[in-house]
Amino acid sequence: MTTSSHGTAPFLPGEHGELLQALAEQRTLLLITVRDITDAQAAQRTTVSELTLGGIVKHLTRCEQVWTQIMVKGEGELPEGMLDLEQYRMVEGETLAGLLEQYTAAAQGTEESVAALPDLGRSVPLPKTPWSPPETVHWSARRILLHVIRETAQHGGHADIIREALDGASTTAQR
């Protein structure tokens, strides 16, 4: 199985492949959005939001790592760092290139883990979080993957707004 740094998922037949391809397409749009920016630009706030382009890449990396771990382990345990607010911002010493390398590695890990799952209908208990109901909630592996796709698409839209405010570029104008 191979994955390019441009967000192309490996070919897998059926639902596994279709969902991974949808995720890869959203990753590709994010990579277009952050193309040709400096580390300083990646760390710069351009709206009243705390979000930055680098922070979005960092968060989506952590998002894939955490949700893949939840999906694969299926233990309902809160992964270390899931609630860490540092995942939303670039810190001193981080570079966009380094964050993108980590994002590519997380993407490959997601793809390998999903490809190895025999059943996307597998029920997984979600970890307890401050926003979850008191009872244990279960999602299918499929729903977890759909959540990762939604997170990537939603934050990709945020990234596009931040980029346009930064230098006038947008994802569609760069294609």
Regions found by a protein language model. Give the residues of each.
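Short, contiguous alpha-helical
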Residues: 2-9, 16, 20-35, 39-86, ...
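Acidic/histidine-rich alpha-helical segments that form the ligand environment
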Residues: 88-127, 140-153
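Active-site rim elements
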Residues: 14-19, 96-100
